[in-house]
């Protein structure tokens, strides 16, 4: 039996996640290992959730991106 074709919503999330990962690696000075560790660590600014736990919605992905923006520009509050 064939796998179902990915619906539009899923492909949008996949694209946003891909862009987020690329951005995150840049924020962590192209050190992918550091970025991957950060993704698995609970973060205060994300309500003590891990960034990777929020990647199931557009809103969650945007929250993680906002957090990365704060890291990039030194505004960790």
Where are these regions (language model features)?
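Non-transmembrane "mature" sequence context
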Residues: 1-77
């Amino acid at each position: 039996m064939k796998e179902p074709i990915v619906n539009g919503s899923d492909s949008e999330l996949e694209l946003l996640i891909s862009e987020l990962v690329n951005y995150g690696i840049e924020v962590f000075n192209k050190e992918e290992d550091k970025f991957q560790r950060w993704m698995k660590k609970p973060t205060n600014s994300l309500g003590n959730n891990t960034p990777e736990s929020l990647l199931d919605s557009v809103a969650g992905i945007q929250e993680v991106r906002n957090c990365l923006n704060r890291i990039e520009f030194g505004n960790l509050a």
